[in-house]
């Protein structure tokens, strides 16, 4: 009798463990599937070389986001960061070391405005429920409908979402979904990139 009970408990625990592993694998697959590979994105920033930047501000306060882009000026990469704090100020971070400038910041997602690099790049920040996120700054629906790569998203009044000036769709920065202005069930959410950050003074990586 004792052996029978033991066997049942063992089988129950085994099945429970296998179910847990299966759920983890499914979640992992979902996370991987959500990463956009349509446009190349590779961003690497050494926070320890630039303490106190708005890049880290965005990753250490829930509901704080920043628009990130880059341009090479006089042989050095300049990183541009504009927080959603309502001040409408863009911080310029000059990468002054050879090690930093060895990296290539040409590919930061879909944006490709040669006149104003600050309209390109991605948006990153810390959500309330899903940790750090990085979204492409271009409207995915206008990219598909009209072609080209110049449909930059801008902050809305509450600065927890962004709006496309062309189609007027509004996207949540918490989830990347459309909250207003949707046209059909086939509307696309924001394109998402993988983000890695271990805390203040550590490297920031965004890419696909």
Predicted regions and their residues:
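Bacterial signal peptide processing site
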Residues: 30-33
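C-terminal motif of bacterial Sec signal peptides marking the signal peptidase cleavage site
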Residues: 25-28
């Amino acid at each position: 009798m004792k052996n029978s009970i033991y066997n049942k408990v063992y089988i129950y625990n085994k099945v429970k463990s296998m179910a847990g592993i299966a759920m983890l694998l499914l979640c992992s697959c979902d996370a991987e599937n959500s990463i956009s590979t349509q446009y190349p994105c590779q961003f690497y920033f050494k926070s320890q070389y630039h303490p106190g930047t708005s890049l880290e501000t965005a990753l250490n306060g829930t509901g704080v986001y920043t628009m990130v882009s880059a341009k090479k000026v006089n042989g050095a990469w300049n990183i541009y960061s504009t927080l959603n704090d309502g001040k409408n100020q863009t911080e310029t971070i000059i990468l002054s070391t050879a090690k930093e400038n060895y990296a290539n910041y040409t590919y930061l997602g879909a944006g490709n405005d040669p006149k104003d690099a600050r309209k390109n790049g991605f948006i990153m920040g810390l959500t309330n429920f899903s940790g750090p996120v990085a979204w492409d700054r271009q409207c995915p629906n206008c990219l598909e409908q009209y072609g080209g790569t110049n449909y930059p998203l801008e902050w809305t009044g509450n600065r927890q979402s962004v709006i496309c000036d062309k189609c007027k769709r509004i996207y949540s920065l918490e989830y990347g979904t459309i909250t207003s202005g949707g046209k059909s069930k086939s509307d696309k959410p924001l394109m998402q990139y993988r983000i890695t950050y271990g805390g203040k003074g550590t490297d920031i990586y965004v890419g696909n």
